[in-house]
Amino acid sequence: MRWRSPIRGPWLTSMFALPLLVGLPVVAFTGLLDRLAYGREQAIPAADAVGGLQLPWWDWPASPAWLFRLTEGLHVGLGIVLVPLVLAKLWSVIPKLFTAPGRNPVTLLERLSLVLLVGSILFLIVTGLLNVQYDYVFGFSFYDGHYAAAWVFLASFALHVVTKLPTMVRSLRGRSLRTELATPLAATRPEPAHPLVAPDPDPPTMSRRGALALVGGGMLFVAALTVGQFTDRLRSTALLLPRGRTTAPDSTERGGPNDFPVNRTFVASGIAPAAVGSAWTLTLTGGTAPVVLDRAALAALPQHTAELPIACVEGWSTAQVWTGVRLTDLARAAGVTDPETAEVRSAEVGSPFARSLLNRGQTVSPDSLLALRVNGAELSPDHGYPARLIVPALPGVHNTKWVVTIGFSRAAPR
């Protein structure tokens, strides 16, 4: 196969690689933080070790409230924005994938890292984009597959950086960026002889500055389509938002207090309407005997209002004003004055996310609520009526909806 682009070469490859050298570790690090946020105590596939690859665990904090919104927004948002740059970088080195590596150990190591790096990053991009769109066509756990591939990526990325960083530095020093940005198409010439440089190039149809502008413009375009997923005021620009830009059932409720994104709808939960109807009650356990409260009794307890975000693993997030009963007040009502943990269960049956386990910090946070209202209005069924959990910095999927039971454990004597 012949590769005849006259602009392909080590300098252009290095220009594409430089921002990836910073951006990809940020995407990887925030992804690992997001996995920690899920917490192994949740006992769901997202938090289990995969092939022995287990992160060190600590209690995910409940402050600042926007922590998970930041880490998940960076992971998904920056990951999507970097896709055009990743593809450009792969295009720039594709001749290397079709040449024999030889028998030199260093060359073999470099080729191995390149193959693993390309394979893992394409896998992560494809599965990540499918997850953002809720399209699980791959037949395996997204959480496990994405997590395992992330470790392959991290190892191959580190190996690739070690072997190629000196080449990148030399290449960047060998040509002036200012000169290249001032070079028009008519004056574009191939780089000096190199395995990436075509020995018999075609006439240029794009300058190097044009290639940089094309990739940069693509990144800006993708950013414009993505930023609205986690910025409430720009949600109307999020053309790729998988759940649409409004969740109102009709035009009369559009822009209302419950018109913000939802992951799992009430219909999708399969809960019988009677289970969350007028006969609904909340059971509190952990004290000497269970305490049962109906919604009127909950509404009669002291109410607390807080503006808190919900952020989901698919990348979208939103901040809303929630009103409800503090978990600490519910713990006292249950007879537990110093709670250590809380287990919150939903009326939904059979879902791995129908149960949420909260650590001490999450349980005793003054803004951790069993919410009854949002933005001054009753919760809609899709948003968890008659009551839902809302905890600062907790992944959205663990802010359990349609809550029926909360069990508190007592703190050990200090």
Describe these PLM feature segments:
Residues 1-246, 260, 385:
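Membrane-embedded alpha-helical bundles that constitute the cytochrome b-like, heme-associated redox core
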Residues 230-236, 242-414:
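Structured, non-membrane catalytic/scaffold regions adjacent to prosthetic-group chemistry
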